[in-house]
Structure formats: structure tokens, C-alpha cells
Design a protein with these regions (language model features):
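Acidic (Asp/Glu-rich) sequence patches and key acidic residues
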Residues: 1-123, 127, 131, 135, ...
Length: 156
């Protein structure tokens, strides 16, 4: 599917990036998320493919952080449609336990997100980023989502 030099990874600001740069930004934002527990921080990486000299975003990896916890989301173009996959933590206490539950949370996008959608495993997150730099590999998140989606479905 991918030929040499027909894709690259970029940040939202259109700046091409490397794994090392993304890893450094992740570490910096992770530390900040521990210091300011009511502000979420994030990192988004896009896989830009070049087809007939026209660049387009085919996959995105979004990482939100709050209080040292990570929320992972993948947007993936499959068959002309975008599919979204979230990491689901099968070891979370109860799917309906919400975290964070700060009434004055700065980022309302994370207010009342179920605890089962967060992980504290920074090494796993680093591996997900590293895989993404390998031609947009998002299998860890997709496989996790497919395997554990029942956890969220049973509480709908």
C-alpha cells in the first residue's frame, strides 16, 4: 500500500515530525498534566498520504491527557469512510465510573468520559505512537476496541 516517500506524519499545525519529536512532546505534556490536574492536554498526529501528488490525511491518532491518564482515539479512512476507534481499558473498575468528574474542568470534551476509556500505561501509549510512525499502523487500538467494545455497549 505504501511506497517509500509517499507518506509522512505531521502535527495538527502542518509541521512534519519525527517519532523523537512526538515522544518529547508527549513527555512534556504528560508532566504538565500531572501538575495541572484540571486542564487536559493533547497531541494529534496525522498520517498524510500522497496520491497523484495530492496530499490527504488518511489516519489520525489523538491522545488526550488529564492527570497522568491517557485517552486514545484513532480516525482511520477505510473504504472511503472514516472509522473511529478508542482504546478501552478492560481493567478499569466499572464502565460507568466517570473520570474526571471536575465541575470546573477546563476541557469539556473530557468531562464525564467513562474511566474505562483511560489508561495510565505511558509505555503502551509510546508504543502506539511508535507504531503510528510505522506507516500509520493503528492495529493495537483497533484490536483493543474490537475486543473490548462490549464493555461500553452493555451500559448504553
Amino acid at each position: 500500500m505504501f511506497e517509500e516517500n509517499n507518506y509522512y506524519i505531521k502535527f495538527v499545525n502542518n509541521k512534519k515530525t519525527t517519532f523523537e519529536e512526538a515522544e518529547a512532546i508527549l513527555e512534556s505534556k504528560y508532566k504538565s498534566s500531572l501538575e495541572n490536574k484540571k486542564q487536559s492536554l493533547g497531541l494529534r498526529l496525522d498520517l498524510v498520504e500522497i496520491e497523484k501528488q495530492i496530499p490527504y490525511i488518511s489516519k489520525s491518532l489523538s491522545i488526550s491527557m488529564l492527570d497522568g491518564k491517557f485517552l486514545l482515539e484513532v480516525s482511520d479512512e477505510d473504504d472511503e469512510e472514516y472509522e473511529n476507534y478508542f482504546y478501552i481499558n478492560p481493567n478499569a473498575p466499572i464502565a460507568l465510573t466517570y473520570y474526571p468528574n471536575y465541575p470546573d474542568l477546563i476541557d469539556n470534551n473530557l468531562h464525564k468520559v467513562p474511566l474505562s476509556m483511560f489508561t495510565e500505561d505511558k509505555e503502551f501509549v509510546r508504543e502506539v505512537i511508535k507504531d503510528f510512525f510505522d506507516k500509520g499502523n493503528t492495529e493495537k487500538i483497533k484490536e483493543n476496541y474490537i475486543k473490548n467494545k462490549w464493555i461500553m455497549d452493555k451500559y448504553k
